[in-house]
């Protein structure tokens, strides 16, 4: 049977574009359909614009700290419109880069909504195409709980396009997106409250990291309200919002921002026309090769719900392209030791097991931990402290986990992730000469276990 394409990719996000480009490079006839924006969540309403806003939010501290170093530039003023305008231009530039990457790779780009008609057919805005393989890489979408007044709330999708910076913001959620945006709004000068229905945010991260970040965010004036949740949202006559909590309290705000989870983007995808099955949580079920229950259809990225991170989707896209069209170069994605960062202020960087995970897995561990005031702040009144922590297997000396809260934690942990991937032991850390004076050298000078 002949097909229009060897591979038809639905979704031009990080994973879909990676799979399409490399499949085309391996000689396959490839098409990509995208209904919204090139680059997916990461480029448009995720990692990239968020990191730009994090940079913007940190300047208030930079200006204040500069005074201790002899700099005086008058009173700093922030303009939201300038930041958002410049951010938009950068995203448009990146959209163009993604377009060029696809076109220059020989990929057919179709801008429109794609819908599955059967196991080998896709319709894009009335046009029908056939493909030997179809890859679903449609990503995820933020969700807001079904409460009265939820139409007054926003998510990360809308936050990047607000016309003005809200004066008072309620951020609802306890995951990394909630913590990052609470840091952003707080750093830019908004009166910010973070509400979370449990006793401490960032479930799944090391307990020491969670508690340390809680304390540091509190120092910066962020109002943290745990064991709290919103029951309803009402719009006031003056346009402000009144959020009634489940305990009866009412909090007033100009913006209620929800970061309470994401769902797979499967709307009107036509899965009912195929044999594709979903998991209990609504993600597309796949095997170790990203194969769905329909032999000709594959899926990757956020839509399969494994590890919802851009670099993971990129690795999955590469694996799919190689397995289908260059099998001699195929290597499965290794989901162990995936480094992660949270771009809160201060940042979190982490790789490997938490202390709790190591103990649950039966490891006898030694914990090395240090909390210190970074050198940059010693001339200032800023009392922010950095946390560095190593979780070490007491039996074979292997470093099981590395965790940090502090400036540029993600940059530091990326390098350590390579060492841990190579099986680094605590002895290897001890024998490594540090770069002085840096914060990073603390990881190779931790000598005495704290427990």
From Swiss-Prot:
Pfam families linked: Pyr_redox_2, Pyr_redox_dim
Gene3D superfamilies: 3.30.390.30, FAD/NAD(P)-binding domain (3.50.50.60)
Transmembrane segments: none
Localization of this protein: Cytoplasm
Entry function: Catalyzes the reduction of glutathione disulfide (GSSG) to reduced glutathione (GSH). Constitutes the major mechanism to maintain a high GSH:GSSG ratio in the cytosol.
Record-given protein name: Glutathione reductase
Entry binding sites for NADP(+): 174, 177, 180, 197, 203, 261, 341
MF annotations from Gene Ontology: flavin adenine dinucleotide binding; glutathione-disulfide reductase (NADPH) activity; thioredoxin-disulfide reductase (NADPH) activity
Subunit structure: Homodimer.
UniProt cofactor note: Binds 1 FAD per subunit.
Matching PANTHER family: GLUTATHIONE REDUCTASE
Lineage: Bacteria, Pseudomonadati, Pseudomonadota, Gammaproteobacteria, Pseudomonadales
GO biological process: cell redox homeostasis
Disulfide partners: 42-47
GO terms for cellular component: cytoplasm
Misc note: The active site is a redox-active disulfide bond.
EC top class named in words: oxidoreductase
SUPFAM superfamilies: FAD/NAD(P)-binding domain (SSF51905), FAD/NAD-linked reductases, dimerisation (C-terminal) domain (SSF55424)
Catalyzed chemical reaction(s): 2 glutathione + NADP(+) = glutathione disulfide + NADPH + H(+)
Residues engaged in binding glutathione: 14, 98
Active site per UniProt: 436
Family, similarity comment: Belongs to the class-I pyridine nucleotide-disulfide oxidoreductase family.
Essential cofactor(s): FAD
EC number: 1.8.1.7
Residues reported to bind FAD: 14-15, 34, 41-42, 50, 114, 302, 310, 436
Keyword vocabulary terms for this entry: Cytoplasm, Disulfide bond, FAD, Flavoprotein, NADP, Oxidoreductase, Redox-active center
